[in-house]
Amino acid sequence: MTSPDQVTRPADTTRISDTALIFEGGGMRASLTSGMVVTLLNAGLAFDWVAGISAGASNAVNYLSGDARRARRSFVDFAADEQFGGLRYFARGQGMFNAEYIYQQAGGPDQALPFDWESFQSSTGDMRIIAFDAVTGDDVVWSRKDTPHIEDLMIRVRASSTMPGLMPPVHLGGHVYVDGAMGEGGGIALSQAQREGFEKFVIVLTQERSYRKVPQRFPAVYRSMFRRYPALGEALLTRWKRYNETRERIFALEAEGKAHVFAPERMPVDNGTRDLSRLAAAHRMGLSQSRRELPAMREFLGVDGTS
């Protein structure tokens, strides 16, 4: 009997040039959407333009490297690593998630979660990783030209994934960066794809269709917490509105036949889940749902099912 996590190799690949592939963030909720990464790779669907924010940035670079096993391990098995994070690391100032280890150490050769840099470099798809400048309140958008070396890539994935208050901000090139979900799309790079001319989208969400974000309680607490970075404090307090508006635009595009949307039928984990059995179950759910929805996605993309 075939394991639901088994990785297969496609007979060939189909390049998709007219459609943007967009991965939402969501911390460990990406354990479920990493199942979509596996399905896309096994199906041989090679998108020429891929964007990700926060945990979606990890899904994006794992997809571009063609590493289905790493896609799963990043959000399932790796959570058991004793250096992954926790209160001990938070107390030391390293973050509830030990970001330097996760993004800048574990991905090296012979490390806990090696990243296939050669395969990433040889892949044809371009990428967009988005982070938020905590000082100016602006988004920064990085592409392949900004990442000539693996170290350049991984620190940018880390910056995009840096949850304010839970992980230390990333200092890079004289700027202070945090999670790209604080930016204009609330964590979904739809506007960036539209600015670059795309009119068709495959969008991988990490919340159920019925989900709506609500305003943060106790705004004065957040403004005080981030008083060094007032633009960040305001962005965090208003994120709910930008996020909900972006999702409304996404579902409108879907109704117009311009977007194929993957939204979890049920999301069994939250952004901080570390329980391996729950994370593995979430991954299997994402794998199963994405496989069931693959024919509809192929039809949307205008490709047959032979690859």
List each language-model region with its residue ranges.
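Patatin-like phospholipase
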Residues: 1-53, 61-307
